[in-house]
């Protein structure tokens, strides 16, 4: 009864939670990957925006922006051409989940990926991003050719 009352007066509210596919993911160069991301418990509009960034192993503290559902100028220069060419994109699925697609995976795509949902909530409460690791592997045929 007390919880219902507190909820009615706005004291108790849903807590935003962003979740991604658990990693690490292991993929070979040239493959197509998809990484799932979802937000729940948001107080804003039913359709949320998503932004994907990567933290590269060579500079793990530096965020490199990849793609966004709300800002076409979001990607850093190293990703702009692939985003505009449709090689990297976000697919919305029913409801709030989205899929980050990277076609023709490159060695430089390995790193820690972060899915972020900009706040649409009245109060900043909960998790607004989640991270996972992608480990790139060379194709076996490429490795064998170099050894020969």
Locations of the language-model features?
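N-terminal Sec-dependent signal peptide, specifically the hydrophobic helical h-region
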Residues: 1-25
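Short beta-strand segments of immunoglobulin-like
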Residues: 21-28, 40-41, 145-147
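Extracellular beta-strand/loop-rich beta-sandwich domains predominantly from IgSF
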Residues: 23-26, 72-110, 119-121
């Amino acid at each position: 009864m007390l919880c219902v009352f507190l909820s009615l007066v706005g004291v108790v509210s849903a807590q935003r939670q962003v979740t991604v596919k658990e990693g690490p993911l292991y993929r070979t160069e040239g493959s197509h990957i998809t990484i799932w991301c979802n937000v729940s418990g948001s107080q804003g509009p039913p359709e949320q925006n998503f932004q994907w960034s990567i933290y590269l192993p060579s500079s793990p503290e530096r965020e490199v922006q990849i793609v966004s559902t709300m800002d076409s100028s979001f990607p850093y220069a190293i990703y702009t051409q692939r985003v505009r060419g449709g090689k990297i994109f976000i697919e919305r699925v029913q409801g709030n989940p989205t899929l980050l697609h990277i076609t023709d995976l490159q060695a430089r795509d390995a790193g820690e990926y972060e899915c972020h949902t900009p706040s649409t909530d009245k109060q900043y409460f909960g998790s607004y991003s989640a991270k996972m690791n992608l480990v790139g592997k060379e194709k076996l045929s490429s490795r064998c050719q170099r050894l020969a």
